Amino acid sequence: VSSLEPGRPVDPAVLRDLLGLTLNEGRIASLVGSGLQPRDAAAALGIAEETARSVLKRVFAKTGVSRQAELVALLARLAF
């Protein structure tokens, strides 16, 4: 297990397993957690920005965070 490197996305499957996210939620969480804005994460995944924001809201609910900065901090605390 290595530490989370700033700007480096976490494997979405790891987030799925550790946080109970779906794989799609893990993908969004990984990209936003690495510092991308939702619109940039959406573009990277080839989905609409509103879809990314909707998925991100579900990620927030499942992880107990309410802001992107809190998600970044949560992923850092998991110390992958």
What are these regions (language model features)?
Residues 35-70:
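Recognition helix of helix-turn-helix DNA-binding domains
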Residues 1-23, 39, 78-80:
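Linker/hinge segments immediately adjacent to helix-turn-helix/homeobox DNA-binding domains
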Residues 32-36, 75:
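Short helix-to-turn junction characteristic of helix-turn-helix DNA-binding domains
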Residues 1-2, 32, 44:
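N-terminal start-of-chain detector that recognizes signal peptides
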Residues 13-19, 30, 57, 61, ...:
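Pre-signature/interface helix of ABC/ABC-like ATPase nucleotide-binding domains
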